[in-house]
């Protein structure tokens, strides 16, 4: 099947930081063509037939807020748009949210383990209310890849966040943690329609049967294709969906249509991609 493809989950860095970004996550590689920089993402997109990628910057330290988002803004192209990074403990977080709105960022990315925050903590309720007011879609790293970490977030935490931000699209990365190490106390049941999951790393970590079972239970209308470039492979993640037993219409929902609907609500869907 041939259709549009939107990759909701990619990461690119300045050249000076790209190698370090790979080392920190245990993906050290000396091949320049495999570094997470814009030129390499564009090349992988062309190879995989991806029409649009969303860059997800991570602000690991509050003092890096401005620098990280300036780079994210500067690196955007017609086929690469960017969410803004936000550290919940940055000074004047409400003001920083207004800045991200002024910068016309497409949404907000959080990574609790890297940022060392419990996003569901009541002290962040004001931040979540402001995000809800501004209408930002949010994409959050979920679960853990290798070992359990103190700040890992699971669906139970999302349920708490929804009390302060009930209206915005919330995208739970890594299939809501279920393509990572399993937490037997967690599930994806009874989450509202504005909560989505992406497929980042699922092609690499999930068996095909389990991958499809999770999606069928959650609903193809709430699943977004994501590769987690450079840590995941765009071609493999796309093939996992295309080779599945879902209908062509359901595959299109996951590969681009669901993401397009979210991006359209914030005016970030390119004109060449029509719903």
Where would I find each of the regions flagged by the language model?
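Mid-to-C-terminal alpha-helical segments outside catalytic/metal-binding sites
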Residues: 1-11, 17-52, 217-224, 235-275
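Conserved, mostly hydrophobic/aromatic
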Residues: 9, 45, 72, 100, ...
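A general structural detector for well-ordered alpha-helical segments in enzyme core domains, enriched
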Residues: 40-44, 68-75, 96-100, 123-127, ...
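Active-site gating/metal-coordination segments in enzymes
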Residues: 51-52, 62-146, 152, 205
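Catalytic pocket-lining loop regions of alpha/beta-barrel enzymes
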Residues: 106-107, 120-224, 272-274
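A cross-domain feature marking catalytic cores of carbohydrate-active enzymes
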Residues: 10, 57, 84-88, 110-112, ...
């Amino acid at each position: 099947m041939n259709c549009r493809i939107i990759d909701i989950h990619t990461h690119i860095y300045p050249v000076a930081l790209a190698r370090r970004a790979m080392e920190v996550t245990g993906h050290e590689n000396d091949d320049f063509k495999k570094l997470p920089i814009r030129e390499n993402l564009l090349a992988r997109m062309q190879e995989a037939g991806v029409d649009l990628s969303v860059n997800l910057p991570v602000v690991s330290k509050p003092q890096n807020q401005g620098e990280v988002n300036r780079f994210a803004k500067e690196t955007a192209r017609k086929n690469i748009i960017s969410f803004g990074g936000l550290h919940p403990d940055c000074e004047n977080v409400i003001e920083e949210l207004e800045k991200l709105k002024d910068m016309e960022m497409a949404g907000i990315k959080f990574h609790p383990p890297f940022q060392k925050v419990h996003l569901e903590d009541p002290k962040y309720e004001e931040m979540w209310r402001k995000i809800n007011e501004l209408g930002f879609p949010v994409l959050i790293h979920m679960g853990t890849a290798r070992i359990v970490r103190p700040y890992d977030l699971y669906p139970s935490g999302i349920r708490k966040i929804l009390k302060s931000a009930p209206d915005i699209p919330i995208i739970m990365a890594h299939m809501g943690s279920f393509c990572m190490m399993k937490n037997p106390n967690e599930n994806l049941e009874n989450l509202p329609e504005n909560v989505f999951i992406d497929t980042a790393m699922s092609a690499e970590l999930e068996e095909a049967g389990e991958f499809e079972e999770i999606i069928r239970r959650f609903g193809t209308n709430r699943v977004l294709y994501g590769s987690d470039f450079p840590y995941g492979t765009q071609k493999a993640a796309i093939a996992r969906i295309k080779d599945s037993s879902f209908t062509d219409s359901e595959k299109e929902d996951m590969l681009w249509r669901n993401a397009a609907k979210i991006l359209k609500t914030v005016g970030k869907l390119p004109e060449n991609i029509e719903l």
